[in-house]
């Protein structure tokens, strides 16, 4: 299948149109028209080769929402017209112990990432959701619940599952004592999910700048980590702390906040941690397909709908909407036309605000 994507050719190049040849459908494949694709900060890291393993041309995008347009001969889960979602994985061996128990992200043979990876069979480079069409194994497509706004569902595929997985793994429920460090794209998801699970939620940040936003999202309390007295009073107060901060930082000051048998899960960290005790935290990869299906259920998904109106980028990179994306603000995600990809993607450079954004294919309603 020939389709159009948007790729970067080098670590310092902007996104540009790129012709993609999607594979012919295998028996268990579905082909989908991409309607929306979330913009994750991982996309920028990969495009800029921040981690040293980017393969160019690189087509980012792993928060993908679309509709099925064709199915393979053995597909049983989906039919043409179904709304589906694809996250950061598109394949795994499906027979190892981890895959059999729904932990495909821990596949013994290695899972296949949606982009910047190699197909398990052909070894061709995988290209992501910044494109008009995608072909994926049916086991790695998720059904989008009826009635859910497709644009707002996209960030569930990365930010959503990344924060939902530890809440589910550590059995958070009514009365659970949860701390969330940071209030960007991951942090606001963690707060809304934990609140929906009935937990008692405290948001932590260096200053009080995000206090009002945290409380508006449903958090019970706000804790400024630079307030020594408040931090001391909070000792032993949490059974789970989810650290969503995406830059190098010292986690040691948060360890005393954990109760006996408490856990600090680091989901936002990029790069090396400052000195710390590795026995005091967990760093699981984003959840498996089973977790993703739970995260995308109608009840959980509806709770994550953004309250803000969608923003649109203008072609003028100095236009007001572009400044709004560049500025540090409280908005969480924006549906954006793919035709405006240049100004938006470049607007993220050097500004790791952690917000989740969504691009819309310009041929979609």
Annotate each PLM feature.
Residues 258-259:
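Helix-to-beta-strand junctions that scaffold the AdoMet/dcAdoMet cofactor pocket
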Residues 262-263:
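Glycine-centered, small-residue-biased loops immediately flanking beta-strands
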Residues 268-282, 294-302:
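Rossmann-fold NAD(P)-binding glycine/threonine-rich loop
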Residues 174-183, 188, 193-253:
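Adenosine-nucleotide cofactor-binding segment
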Residues 1-3, 294-352, 356:
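C-terminal hydrophobic helical "lid"/dimerization subdomain
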Residues 77, 93-181:
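NAD(P)H dinucleotide-binding glycine-rich loop of Rossmann-like/cofactor-binding domains
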Residues 23-37, 50-100, 105, 127, ...:
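Glycine-rich beta-strand-centered segment in the early N-terminal region that forms part
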């Amino acid at each position: 299948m020939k389709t159009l994507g948007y790729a970067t050719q080098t670590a310092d190049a902007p996104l540009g149109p790129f012709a993609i040849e999607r594979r012919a459908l295998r028996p268990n494949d579905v082909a989908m028209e991409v309607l929306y694709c979330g913009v994750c900060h991982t996309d920028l890291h990969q495009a800029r080769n921040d981690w040293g393993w980017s393969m160019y041309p690189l087509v980012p995008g792993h928060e993908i929402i679309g509709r099925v347009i064709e199915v393979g001969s053995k597909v049983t889960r989906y039919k043409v017209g179904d709304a589906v979602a694809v996250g950061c994985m598109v394949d795994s061996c499906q027979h190892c112990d981890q895959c059999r128990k729904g932990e495909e992200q821990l596949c013994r043979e290695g899972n296949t990432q949606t982009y910047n990876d190699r197909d398990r069979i052909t070894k061709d480079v995988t290209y992501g959701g910044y494109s008009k069409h995608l072909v994926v194994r049916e086991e790695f497509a998720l059904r989008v619940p009826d009635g859910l706004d497709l644009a707002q569902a996209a960030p569930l595929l990365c930010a959503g599952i990344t924060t939902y997985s530890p809440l589910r793994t550590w059995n958070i429920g009514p009365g659970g004592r949860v701390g969330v460090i940071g209030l960007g794209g991951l942090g606001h998801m963690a707060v809304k999910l934990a609140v929906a699970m009935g937990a008692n939620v405290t948001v932590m940040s260096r200053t009080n700048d995000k206090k009002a936003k945290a409380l508006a999202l449903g958090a019970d309390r706000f804790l400024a980590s630079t307030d020594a007295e408040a931090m001391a009073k909070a000792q032993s107060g949490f059974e789970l702390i989810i650290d969503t901060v995406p830059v190098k930082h010292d986690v040691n000051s948060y360890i005393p906040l954990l109760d006996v048998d408490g856990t600090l899960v680091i989901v936002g960290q990029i790069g090396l941690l400052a000195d710390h005790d590795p026995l005091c935290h967990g760093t699981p990869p984003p959840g498996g397909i089973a977790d993703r299906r739970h995260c995308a259920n109608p009840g959980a998904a509806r709770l994550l709908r953004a309250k803000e109106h969608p923003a649109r980028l203008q072609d003028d990179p100095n236009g007001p909407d572009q400044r709004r994306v560049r500025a540090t603000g409280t908005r969480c995600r924006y549906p954006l036309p793919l035709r405006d990809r240049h100004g938006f993607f470049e607007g993220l450079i050097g500004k790791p605000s952690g917000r989740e954004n969504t691009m819309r294919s310009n041929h979609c309603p």
